[in-house]
Amino acid sequence: MVEADRPGKLFIGGLNLETDEKALEAEFGKYGRIVEVLLMKDRETNKSRGFAFVTFESPADAKAAARDMNGKSLDGKAIKVAQATKPAFESSRRGPPPPRSRGRPRFLRGTRGGGGGPRRSPSRGGPDDDGGYTADFDLRPSRAPMPMKRGPPPRRVGPPPKRAAPSGPARSSGGGMRGRALAVRGRDGYSGPPRREPLPPRRDPYLGPRDEGYSSRDGYSSRDYREPRGFAPSPGEYTHRDYGHSSVRDDCPLRGYSDRDGYGGRDRDYGDHLSRGSHREPFESYGELRGAAPGRGTPPSYGGGGRYEEYRGYSPDAYSGGRDSYSSSYGRSDRYSRGRHRVGRPDRGLSLSMERGCPPQRDSYSRSGCRVPRGGGRLGGRLERGGGRSRY
């Protein structure tokens, strides 16, 4: 670590305290031109400390002088002559400062960046300047990490809202299958919009799905919705075909349908969804089943006299954009139409209009499961007749 001082500078040690600069210059001037003679003196007493530095203009002269003069006696004392080296205190003064200067910026950078500095400085109660920095930077880092900590929870919370948003409709539907129906819809990609879209497409969607194999009685239910069977049934699957979404309402009697068809719960949930959206108008148009004359105007036709029956295998899904819960319900609706509450005398004349139209209002048959609807007896029978005459 000992560094040579500038070339041509010699260290002369072991001098007599009486020897001065002039004596040194006279002694070493024989080897070459001397640039500087520096006799080290005590600051307080101003007396020689016994060593000096002589700088030659030419490094070669310095080397010759060191070679010749080393160990010779000057003023009665043997002197030591060698290439001058940087003093230890000087090198230490210069050396350590760079690390210190480097270290301090590092410390400040740490405090600025991650707040590591602030943690250290309080523990040791560092200098004021460091403390000031830590005070300044402490706020920033302390704030920064907290947002980082807070950040992830929002992310975690975010997805649940997404899940919950779909659940909103399911919950409002009030079906026993809320979660399951929701999952079912999510799985098939049926969301809110399909509920409203169905009205126009109702005419042909039946053919498409029917051809695709959805018309099978259990096509939808058995295929996608087996899980829901265990749920509290809503008025069974006879809903769409014969009673026209009687399952659409939750108030529809749940009793006696689950045993006949495990799909009640499913229908109930989907019935609600559909009734709320695309099928409300059709149901209302048939609301007369409850008490008004059915002449309120036949609801939109779905493709002709028997088409509705043909597609009774379709759940309102067919109407509501392909929702899947009613296929089985329609497939089995015949049983209900024939076996359950036969109200009134089947009358073929009206069955056609009923077939053409959307199912009755949700209210009319939501209660029809329990009692014959007011003013709807004959109409119900006709509906049943229409169902009986269907291809199924």
From Swiss-Prot:
Residues 8-86 form the RRM domain. It is found in: Nucleus. This is RNA-binding motif protein, X-linked-like-2. The lineage of its organism: Eukaryota, Metazoa, Chordata, Craniata, Vertebrata. PANTHER family: TRANSFORMER-2 SEX-DETERMINING PROTEIN-RELATED. One of its GO terms (cellular component) is ribonucleoprotein complex. GO terms for molecular function: mRNA binding; snRNA binding. The keyword rRNA-binding does not apply.
